[in-house]
Structures are given as structure tokens and as C-alpha cells.
UniProtKB/Swiss-Prot annotation:
<keyword id="KW-0032">Aminotransferase</keyword>
<comment type="pathway">
    <text>Amine and polyamine biosynthesis; ectoine biosynthesis; L-ectoine from L-aspartate 4-semialdehyde: step 1/3.</text>
</comment>
<dbReference type="InterPro" id="IPR015421">
    <property type="entry name" value="PyrdxlP-dep_Trfase_major"/>
</dbReference>
<dbReference type="InterPro" id="IPR012773">
    <property type="entry name" value="Ectoine_EctB"/>
</dbReference>
<keyword id="KW-0663">Pyridoxal phosphate</keyword>
<comment type="similarity">
    <text>Belongs to the class-III pyridoxal-phosphate-dependent aminotransferase family.</text>
</comment>
<dbReference type="InterPro" id="IPR015422">
    <property type="entry name" value="PyrdxlP-dep_Trfase_small"/>
</dbReference>
<dbReference type="GO" id="GO:0019491">
    <property type="term" value="P:ectoine biosynthetic process"/>
</dbReference>
<protein>
    <recommendedName>
        <fullName>Diaminobutyrate--2-oxoglutarate transaminase</fullName>
        <ecNumber>2.6.1.76</ecNumber>
    </recommendedName>
</protein>
<dbReference type="GO" id="GO:0045303">
    <property type="term" value="F:diaminobutyrate-2-oxoglutarate transaminase activity"/>
</dbReference>
<dbReference type="InterPro" id="IPR004637">
    <property type="entry name" value="Dat"/>
</dbReference>
<dbReference type="InterPro" id="IPR015424">
    <property type="entry name" value="PyrdxlP-dep_Trfase"/>
</dbReference>
<feature type="modified residue" description="N6-(pyridoxal phosphate)lysine">
    <location>
        <position position="269"/>
    </location>
</feature>
<dbReference type="GO" id="GO:0030170">
    <property type="term" value="F:pyridoxal phosphate binding"/>
</dbReference>
<dbReference type="GO" id="GO:0047307">
    <property type="term" value="F:diaminobutyrate-pyruvate transaminase activity"/>
</dbReference>
<dbReference type="Pfam" id="PF00202">
    <property type="entry name" value="Aminotran_3"/>
</dbReference>
<dbReference type="InterPro" id="IPR049704">
    <property type="entry name" value="Aminotrans_3_PPA_site"/>
</dbReference>
Amino acid sequence: MITAETNVFESLESNVRGYCRNWPTVFTTAKGAWLQDEDGKDYLDFFAGAGALNYGHNNPVLKQPLIDYIASDGITHGLDMSTAAKRKLLETLRDTVFAPRGLDYKVQFPGPTGANAVEAALKLARKVTGRETVLSFTNAFHGMTLGALSVTGNAAKRAGAGVPLVHAAHMPYDGYFDNTTADFQWMERVLDDTSSGFDRPAAVIVETVQGEGGINVARVEWLQHLAQLCAEREILLIVDDVQMGCGRTGPFFSFEVAGITPDIVTLSKSIGGYGLPLALVLFKPELDQWAPGEHNGTFRGNNPAFVTAQVALETFWSDGALEAATKAKGEKVATELATVAGHFPGLSTRGRGLVHGIAFEDPSQAGKVCQVAFERGLLVETSGSSDEVVKLLPPLTITDDELDQGLQILTGAIDTVCTGWGRLHHRAPAEGGERR
């Protein structure tokens, strides 16, 4: 609804805006798992900045060091100059993330976004191998710039490019054929047949869980087979951990569950800790064949984000507490969603860690559930090729009570949409998510 308070968005901001159309209010403050709008209404956040706020809004553990850094006139814009904040981040990344996992990676700062990281990864893979094609998968999403779009599956997003998207080919993701065709049968055949007309690719890029694609979860054995396939054919393996990294699936890296070591990893979103723009590309040392300045970006040295990223790593990843808590909360979400899905035909669930989805055979129901949930004080969005999946991405730091409250609103919204009345036992408040 357009009001005097929202008219400026309608009159001045581009039609490309999206989220505000689904959540038609003006937000003012946020803390932890909550946002508040101008009317003082509270909303539980099961969206978390599309995965950029794994540690919640304005986490005090991160906020105070950021305030102190700014107050001390610390470097803000540093390009790729050496700064004290960058040094501390690199040291903490090495000691807290790499060393305990036995990883040997070089670190590149490509720019502030996940798409920047993907573009750099694709560019590096092609440079190192001398090959052009990159393989990706059905329903993949890797960003909105041209290179990232070329390895993205969604037709609507690809259409926005306005030019042919070349030097990429798409393969079936795990479960694409509903387990009626052996995994990798097509991929292996065309790669190994010299008459297939299919040139050996530079790399394969994959999400271990496809977030925008509909919460499609790759099985451990599928990921292991993919890693082996790439290694045997000297194809670089890129894992896009922009949304699923930084603990979203439980471990820091989403690929840890499969025991594989990608050649290249892209990180963004929650790597900055506080929601500040930051992206990293990690790669094996022998792949570091960049010439100085061969790839750059004006805002690759966002030092305030270095500060909050370092504190987040030190605070949340020095032990296994967050990983264990995420897995426990994820099990609760899975159980609750399975219960509500069992009450209605045409519903199915999927997920890992604290990324979960509930899919509807009637895609229109997913959007209606999100609308009802918003009216009752919960932010959730849809994903999938037809927006048929309600996607849950709560902050990893959400409390058990907040998680229960959000699930109560969500399951009540599902009940309302699927039956037209509140048949289930869950209380579904008509107005706002009252903080408990």
C-alpha cells in the first residue's frame, strides 16, 4: 500500500526493487533476530539479509569493536594496501579457520560482493587452465553480473543479461532426475567421449545447498563423486559458499560434511560478520598465478568489515559451540516442518543446518504463506524456479524461544493458507510478532 511515508520509494526508486514489495512497511531498527518498523511493530527475521546476517542484527559483540575502530580514525577505505585491520583478519582466518581444518589457501579480496568473488574465481580458473568453459548445475544461482549469470540456471535472471551468456554449460544437479537416472552418467559420458563435441572445461562451480534454487541439498556421496570426477580429469572444483558458508549448514564451510577440499572457494555475505560488504576468494597456492593488479576492485579493502569479520571469527569459530547449536536448532526446524508437512498433501521439506525449505506443489501457496507470516510478524521469502519453496534462513544466534516463536507463526500461516482456518494447535497471532 502506498502512503505518504512510502511514496518516495514509489516515485524515486527503480522498479527493480523487490523485497519491499513483499514486506510493505518502513523498517527503522533491528537487534538480534528482530526488526521494528515505524509503527513500532516487531518482526522476527527468518531471512537474515539473504544469509548476510548469520550473527544477527547489530550483534553487540561486533558492534562495539566497530564503533571503537571508527572512533579511533581507523582506515576505512584501503584498496589492497596493507593495514593493521587486514593483517589481524588474515591471521585470525589462518589460525581459526584454515589451520584446524588442515587447509592451505591463499586469500584474495576481489570486491565487496559475492558476485565479485564468483567473477574472480571464474577468471582465475580460466587463466590457470587456459580453458574457457565452466560447468555449473541446473537451478544454480551465482550472482547477477554477466560471468556469474552465465553459470546461473534461472531463466528469468539470465534473461536480464541482454546478451548471449557463453562459455558455460549446465549439468543436472543431485536429484534432478528424481533418482531415476544414475548421477553423473551424462556428465561423465560427454567429458570422456572425444566425439561428444564437449571441450574439457576449466572448472566446475557448485553450491552444496542451492539456496535460491529451492533449498536443493546435495548428498555427501554426490559431492564426493563430483570432487573425484574433477580431480581425475584435472578440472578445478569451485565451491560457491557465498550463502551457505560461515556456518549456515553447521560447519564453517558447507563442504566440510563431505570431507572434500575444493580448489577454489568463494565467500561473502556473512564473512563480514556485521552485514558489512566483504568478499573473499580462497584458492590453493599453486593457483595463485595473478599478476599484480590483474584483478582489482575499488572497494575490496573495506577495513571496517575486516574488523567485524575478525571479531566474528574469533568469537564464534574458536570452538565448536556455534556449530553444535546450529545443528541442534536445525534438527528442531526439520522436525517442526516435517510435522506440518504431514498434515497436508503436496508439501515436502528439505534442508541442512539452519537453512530449510518447505515446498508446495501449488507454487502460489508459498507466496501466500509468506504474506500471512509477514502480517503476523515473521519475515520469510520464497525460492525455487517457480517460487514454490518457503525458505528459512534465521540468524544462527537466534534463541530457542525466538526460533519456537517463529516456527509457530510459520506453521500457523501454512495452516491458514492450506485449510483456510487454524486447524493445527499452533497459535497464529493476527498482529505482529510480540517479543517474548
